[in-house]
């Protein structure tokens, strides 16, 4: 008889003031930077930045996402998963979600972004308000198999504009830290 494993617990997302132990300075600098990650990655890559869409579809949102968006568990929403790349290397895995009802009311065509960065949209539209950044060690089983690793730092923020809330999670992959070590002046 096969033995089934219990589901892995969801991570505990924490704001900066509640985080302990605190990551090193270089990691914290990237985790808690409130500017555009797209712009920062573009600068680090000397404009060799690109976005590779992995998933763009309606799905049942994870319970931690529903809680962050103030939705009932098992709510349906738009899920967009991408790699943010520098020089063709996946530096960041990003997952953005929004409730179906909020997207319909909010007038944002997130499903039409394709290979464009969501960050461009969020930081160019001054009507969006960013909520506090939360961080965690992102669960390996939530990552694409090609980059699945234990203990990777992730961050997330909710961006609000009227009835629309988008939850954006960004997981920093080992290749990013390698690039930062090679080009500290570009950070």
Swiss-Prot record:
Gene Ontology cellular component terms for the protein in this record: cytosol
Its job: Removes the pyruvyl group from chorismate, with concomitant aromatization of the ring, to provide 4-hydroxybenzoate (4HB) for the ubiquinone pathway.
Disulfide pairings: none
Pathway(s) of this molecule: Cofactor biosynthesis; ubiquinone biosynthesis
Protein name: Probable chorismate pyruvate-lyase
Binding sites annotated in the UniProt record for substrate: 80, 118, 170
PANTHER family cross-referenced by the UniProt entry: CHORISMATE PYRUVATE-LYASE
Species, as recorded: Pseudomonas fluorescens (strain ATCC BAA-477 / NRRL B-23932 / Pf-5)
Protein localization: Cytoplasm
